[in-house]
Amino acid sequence: MREKLSPHVRALLEAVDAEGRPPVEELSLQEARQAALEGTRKLGGEPEPVALVEDVRIAGPAGMIPLRIYTPEGKAPNPALIYFHGGGWVVCNLDTHDVVCRALARRS
């Protein structure tokens, strides 16, 4: 299966395998969440600066939904991008994808 993946993705998976961590399905929920946070921080590098980061909550059909708004440097109006990453709707969260979202905000 991995032979069908791009060389970059294969290298990423090999780096994760080399750490010798147990498979995510063998971890408790809390362990899986911590591993995801550590892994994304390690692979993502330092977060890039943006003009403003705001954490807000909006009402959803099953309760409040956390959102993070990234405002890039420069004059408005700015483009809008909505980034959904469910992480299986269990493991990942706003912090695990902060580096990615900051990079998207700066380059959009």
Report each predicted region and the residues it spans.
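Short glycine/proline-enriched loop/turn "hinge" motifs that connect secondary-structure elements
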Residues: 73-75, 105-106
